[in-house]
Curated annotation (Swiss-Prot):
InterPro entries: BioW
Record protein name field: 6-carboxyhexanoate--CoA ligase
Known role: Catalyzes the transformation of pimelate into pimeloyl-CoA with concomitant hydrolysis of ATP to AMP.
One Pfam family recorded for the sequence: BioW
Family assignment from sequence similarity: Belongs to the BioW family.
Molecular function GO labels: 6-carboxyhexanoate-CoA ligase activity; ATP binding; magnesium ion binding
Enzyme class: ligase
Pathway note: Metabolic intermediate metabolism; pimeloyl-CoA biosynthesis; pimeloyl-CoA from pimelate: step 1/1
Amino acid sequence: MQHEHIYFSVRMRAAQGGSHEQGGKHISGGEKIVPYHDLSSCMAELAEKGLNHSRGKPDFMNIQFEQIEEAVKYVSPLPVGTHVVSSVADGQATARSLLTEAGIKPQVIEEAYYVLSELTELRGALFIDAATGQRLDDPIKNGVRVTRMDWPLDDFSCWLNEHQLSPNIRMKEALALATKVTQHPATIAELCWSDDPDYITGYVASQKFGYQRISQLKELGEEKGCRIFFVDQTKMKNLDAYINYLTTQPVLIRWKQEVMADESRSMAGRAAE
């Protein structure tokens, strides 16, 4: 069997005080899509991430991999912008402004913030109906975890160099997730900030304006994160189909190949002139 042309989905989750299902505190999680020959190093990397995390030391960790049977979807990363703010209040005001620009009504935005405020911990994404502000996902499950997406490091490094940005693995992971989520036509916008106490940057993402980083969306030391998807139910078959896309459709981000393709098309066009 030729493994080199087959991809595997690798997932890690770590908790403290027992497993997540037993009510343990979420410590860390990770997602990778890799060929067979990278499985060993990938699992070691995810284990290291879970064992050395600012949220604490886990006493439970699960790492699993499975061969991907579905066709992998290759997509270009969202365009990126950055908003430097001086306070959490300014950052949150910027987030609200961007959500409004994406087409979310102010009352729906405030309803989403209220739903978030009632939760003590969020392990995945909340779904908010962009028309009504109603929460659509199952509250018992405490959020839907998006899986099966990645951005190969060599391609990401080329993207960083082109955009003159410093290496940032957090951005790599977040931009890969946001790109997958907003590829679905039902996702109008995503609002996110990390549950890591030492990371205060967050973002709003939308197909309308890309991935907009906001330098501060919470106070340093705060462990409560946020991930909200504002969705248009008229653009999905049903909620189960939307969740199925988020949790099972494999997506790999490709930037370098798209640039090369654009250059080839441009050269072909000039040659034809």
